[in-house]
Amino acid sequence: MSRRAGTPTAKKVTQLVNEEEHVEGFRQVREAHRRELIDDYVELISDLIREVGEARQVDMAARLGVSQPTVAKMLKRLATMGLIEMIPWRGVFLTAEGEKLAQESRERHQIVENFLLVLGVSPEIARRDAEGMEHHVSEETLDAFRLFTQKHGAK
């Protein structure tokens, strides 16, 4: 039987979840947004030290596209959290906890990026999309991405 013009097709309707699930979902998103900047900064500091031997505020500002005062404010926050040490005239260094967080963030990024590549996403888009997605997926989802990538072959 053919469908008449103007007749809507059947669509799956998303059901509104109960209030507790809704609250928990938004709480997780807020927490991911809060951690996103922290993860990005410690990962960048680690990358700069590894690639150029030092992490300077001016370099971080240039790479993040923000002002130096914005970087300085975040660095104070990271120092208060015990993730970095700022040594005058020498630069910024990660504590053991900061390096651990940078490594975890780097691994999350790589898992998401590899998954996107296996799906056929172009390398440049996969890299950019992974940068945002890595902060918003659960460990369960990361495990599924990792398993899928292993099963279907990393490109």
From Swiss-Prot:
It is found in: Cytoplasm. InterPro entries: DtxR_MntR_Metal-Reg, Fe_dep_repressor, Fe_dep_repressor_sf, HTH_DTXR, Iron_dep_repressor, WH-like_DNA-bd_sf, WH_DNA-bd_sf. SUPFAM superfamilies: Iron-dependent repressor protein, dimerization domain (SSF47979), Winged helix' DNA-binding domain (SSF46785). It holds the Pfam family Fe_dep_repr_C. Residues 34-95 form the HTH dtxR-type domain. SMART domains: HTH_DTXR (SM00529). Keywords: Activator, Cytoplasm, DNA-binding, Manganese, Repressor, Transcription, Transcription regulation. GO terms for molecular function: DNA binding; DNA-binding transcription factor activity; protein dimerization activity; transition metal ion binding. GO terms for cellular component: cytoplasm. Gene3D superfamilies: Iron dependent repressor, metal binding and dimerisation domain, Winged helix-like DNA-binding domain superfamily/Winged helix DNA-binding domain. The keyword Manganese applies. Homodimer. It contains an N-terminal DNA-binding domain and a metal-binding domain. PANTHER family: IRON (METAL) DEPENDENT REPRESSOR, DTXR FAMILY, TRANSCRIPTIONAL REGULATOR MNTR. In the presence of manganese, represses expression of mntH and mntS. Up-regulates expression of mntP. This is Transcriptional regulator MntR. It comes from Escherichia coli O157:H7. The lineage of its organism: Bacteria, Pseudomonadati, Pseudomonadota, Gammaproteobacteria, Enterobacterales.
